[in-house]
């Protein structure tokens, strides 16, 4: 009988037009105490972000079919191109999760983190300058997931529904309630042709006469609304053009996936045709004396793309054209992403 190793180390690399160059390393032990406990140390470095996290998971907490664990993390993000500031966070989270059925599971998570808005430029919006410095977030969240997809990559049928409710307050300096919902449905029309339709929406509201900081608001554009730049849609300072985030958002997408004519199926190339819509609006920026450009107008973009499941990982190129937009929106026609692990 040969004993198999339960530890592994992996490396990753990637690039996207929204996140820049990315690289990561992960060290994992899947049987720490001989009962399937998992511990993982991960480091992700990018031109616009850095993430370090240590996680531990007990798969059968209290001898039940319930997972529990913790995460310790530090993140930093360069948002100079979006709103002339950078931000970081350090903290920990406690979590537990269990399955109700084959397709339904629930996750409860408590997070305590200290965030910092720094490197604020002198020409940044008054809203950004007023929020420079540290804040503490104490957040309790609950997520329910219903997943009937046949596969996670190149899905041909099934649903994915996810709803998260979070409340921040208690020992923290931030007081807000937030909910987000995502839904997508996949259906094969005929051989190798799949249509998917989906949507998302979110709301975040303050309480106790507080305001919601930039890093707790929603931003729209890039990966979640093609045809528009990262944070290209939503409330914006009329003078500095800084993106200020919003309290309310929604998106919808319809996408057709199909084989490319004359290309052998074995090469793994797929064509994409899509329509994305969405909007982001509402914040408290006016209380800082800023003149804010804001609108609930639905933005619409349509486009084509190519996806290749290469030996080095998935590669995708999209070209989208905004059809409906506001004058102050920032657009981005091409999106490119590549990622692999080895």
Tell where the protein language model's regions lie, with residue ranges:
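Gram-negative/organellar outer-membrane beta-barrel architecture
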Residues: 1-161, 226-227, 231-238, 314-316, ...
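C-terminal outer-membrane beta-barrel translocator/porin domains of Gram-negative envelope proteins
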Residues: 7-18, 111-291, 328, 336-341
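Short, glycine/acidic-rich beta->alpha junctions
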Residues: 48, 88, 175-179, 297-298
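C-terminal structured "cap/appendage" subdomains that terminate the fold
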Residues: 282, 287-330, 334
């Amino acid at each position: 009988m040969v004993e198999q190793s339960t530890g592994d180390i992996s490396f990753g690399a990637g690039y996207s037009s929204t996140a820049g160059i990315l690289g990561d390393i992960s060290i994992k032990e899947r049987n720490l105490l001989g009962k399937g406990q998992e511990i993982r140390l991960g480091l992700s470095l990018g031109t616009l972000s850095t993430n370090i996290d240590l996680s531990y998971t007990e798969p059968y907490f209290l001898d039940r079919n319930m997972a529990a664990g913790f995460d310790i993390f530090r993140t930093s993000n360069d948002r100079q191109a979006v709103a002339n500031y950078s931000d970081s966070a350090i903290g920990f989270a406690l979590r537990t999760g269990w399955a109700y059925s084959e397709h339904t599971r629930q996750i409860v998570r408590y997070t305590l983190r200290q965030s910092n808005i720094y490197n604020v430029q002198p020409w940044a919006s008054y809203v950004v300058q007023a929020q420079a410095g540290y804040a503490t977030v104490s957040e309790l969240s609950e997520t329910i997931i219903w997943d009937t997809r046949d596969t996670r990559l190149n899905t041909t049928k099934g649903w994915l529904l996810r709803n998260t409710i979070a409340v921040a307050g208690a020992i923290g300096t931030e007081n807000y309630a937030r909910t987000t919902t995502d839904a997508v449905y996949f259906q094969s029309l005929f051989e190798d042709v799949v249509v998917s339709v989906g949507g998302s929406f979110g709301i975040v509201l303050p309480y106790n006469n507080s305001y919601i900081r930039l890093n707790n608001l929603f931003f729209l554009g890039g990966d979640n609304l093609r045809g528009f730049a990262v944070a290209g849609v939503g409330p914006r300072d009329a003078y500095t053009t800084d993106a200020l985030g919003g309290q309310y958002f929604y998106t919808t997408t319809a996408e057709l996936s199909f084989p490319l004519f004359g290309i052998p199926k074995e090469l793994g190339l797929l064509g994409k045709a899509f329509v994305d819509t969405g909007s982001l609006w509402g914040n408290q920026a006016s209380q800082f004396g800023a003149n804010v450009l804001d609108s609930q107008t639905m933005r619409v973009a349509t486009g084509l793309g190519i996806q290749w499941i290469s030996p080095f990982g998935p590669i995708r190129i999209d070209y989208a054209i905004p059809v409906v937009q506001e004058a102050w929106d920032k657009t981005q026609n091409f999106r490119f992403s590549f990622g692999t692990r080895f």
